[in-house]
Regions:
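N-terminal low-structure segments adjacent to metalloprotease catalytic domains
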Residues: 1-90, 97
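Charged, low-complexity, helix/coiled-coil-prone segments
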Residues: 24, 50-69, 123-137, 173-183, ...
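Short, charge-rich amphipathic segments
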Residues: 38-62, 113-125, 160-166, 183
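Generic detector of ordered, mature protein regions
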Residues: 65, 72, 83, 130, ...
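Low-complexity, highly charged intrinsically disordered N-terminal segments
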Residues: 67-151
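Active-site scaffold of zinc-dependent metalloenzymes
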Residues: 100-113, 139-189, 193-200
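Metalloprotease/metallohydrolase-associated module, dominated by Zn2+-dependent proteases
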Residues: 204-205
Length: 205
């Protein structure tokens, strides 16, 4: 009896947490009107929200099954179903955390520098399009840069399944810049942009 009471309390807590991370927007990450020139595009937020909504649908599906079956299922089965819901909540937390970290820096003093990095990356893609206009299949979301600890810049390519996101694919390229390398003209940054170009051109090895 006490175990069932505990499980019911656990399920109520899961339900309360389940929809807290289903959407992200400019205001929620602290981007003010004066920050908009440096902010990621609405399409970047749209892609992020599509990913969050997809995860949320899976959370709601598993949660609905749990709520409908827990009272008549074995303790072992209920614990397993709770774990499956918690895994999806963790997936939402990780995805939301990545988007919040990347987007939220556009409301800080690093925003102009990060926007400059973005502009350089876009120029690299533009140069390819000018030479071969049909080489990319339709529009592509540009790379978005953010600051993080590390020794050198690094990239997370479009569509790559990330351990950080429990295997969720990356919806757009993300380039990490170390805190002490906020100089957009550094050549090593172009190296990371080139990795993304290789991937988007289908020649990544």
């Amino acid at each position: 009896m006490e175990t069932r009471v505990f499980l019911k309390t656990k399920i109520v807590a899961l339900k309360a947490r389940a929809r807290r991370l289903a959407q992200i927007d400019y205001a929620s990450v602290g981007i003010r009107p004066q920050d908009l020139p440096y902010a990621p595009s609405p399409n970047h937020f749209r892609a992020a929200n599509q990913r969050l909504r997809k995860i949320d649908r899976e959370i709601q599906r598993r949660l609905a099954h749990l709520q409908a079956s827990w009272s008549n299922s074995s303790i072992h089965r209920v614990l397993l179903d709770i774990a499956l819901v918690e895994r999806e909540v963790d997936r939402a937390r990780r995805a939301f955390g990545l988007f919040f970290e990347v987007f939220g820096q556009r409301g800080t003093t690093f925003a102009p520098v990060l926007a400059a990095y973005d502009a350089i990356a876009v120029d690299c893609y533009t140069a390819i399009r000018q030479v071969a206009p049909q080489i990319f299949r339709g529009p592509l979301l540009k790379p978005v840069c953010y600051m993080e600890h590390g020794f050198s810049p690094a990239t997370m390519r479009r569509g790559v399944q990330l351990n950080r996101l429990l295997g969720e694919p990356n919806p757009f390229p993300v380039i990490r810049i170390p805190w002490d390398r906020d100089n957009p003209w550094q050549a090593v940054f172009l190296h990371e942009v080139a990795h993304n170009l290789q991937a988007d051109l289908g020649i990544w090895q």
